[in-house]
């Protein structure tokens, strides 16, 4: 089972690919997709879509796991995040991948044992749980790894 974990965002989207081989979890790759806030929205969304598509084609995941979002007090921010999620979900659907969504607190509790863990705690635990993640320093990337990890360890596939 190969999971593509996604921490959705418009400016700095985290992605990660984690596999389960027999009882062993294996980190395969991760990264950040950054868009320029000065670019037109449709160009930013197209860039997210085309970059994630390359990841899907390279790693051939069986499923995508994405973090659920909550409505922010800033409606413009929530709307922009919704655009990014729509572009991501459209791509997931185009490749006929199953998809699971996880609440941020569920991911934090699965990885750290505490549903309100801070970013640095998440990063630390990801490095302990999955070999190959030692060079990850970006919290968006670490969150994507954590989302994929959560999908695999909760057997939510």
UniProtKB/Swiss-Prot annotation:
It is found in: Cytoplasm. Its cofactor is Mg(2+). GO terms for biological process: DNA recombination; DNA repair. Mg(2+) 2 binds at residue 67. It catalyses: Endonucleolytic cleavage at a junction such as a reciprocal single-stranded crossover between two homologous DNA duplexes (Holliday junction). Binds 2 Mg(2+) ion per subunit. Its EC number is 3.1.21.10. Gene3D superfamilies: Ribonuclease H-like superfamily/Ribonuclease H. InterPro entries: RNaseH-like_sf, RNaseH_sf, X-over_junc_endoDNase_Mg_BS, X-over_junc_endoDNase_RuvC. Its main location: cytoplasm. Pfam families: RuvC (PF02075). Mg(2+) 1 binds at residues 7, 140. The active site is at 7, 67, 140. GO terms for cellular component: cytoplasm; Holliday junction resolvase complex. Belongs to the RuvC family. Homodimer which binds Holliday junction (HJ) DNA. The HJ becomes 2-fold symmetrical on binding to RuvC with unstacked arms; it has a different conformation from HJ DNA in complex with RuvA. In the full resolvosome a probable DNA-RuvA(4)-RuvB(12)-RuvC(2) complex forms which resolves the HJ. The RuvA-RuvB-RuvC complex processes Holliday junction (HJ) DNA during genetic recombination and DNA repair. Endonuclease that resolves HJ intermediates. Cleaves cruciform DNA by making single-stranded nicks across the HJ at symmetrical positions within the homologous arms, yielding a 5'-phosphate and a 3'-hydroxyl group; requires a central core of homology in the junction. The consensus cleavage sequence is 5'-(A/T)TT(C/G)-3'. Cleavage occurs on the 3'-side of the TT dinucleotide at the point of strand exchange. This is Crossover junction endodeoxyribonuclease RuvC. It comes from Rickettsia rickettsii (strain Sheila Smith). The gene is ruvC.
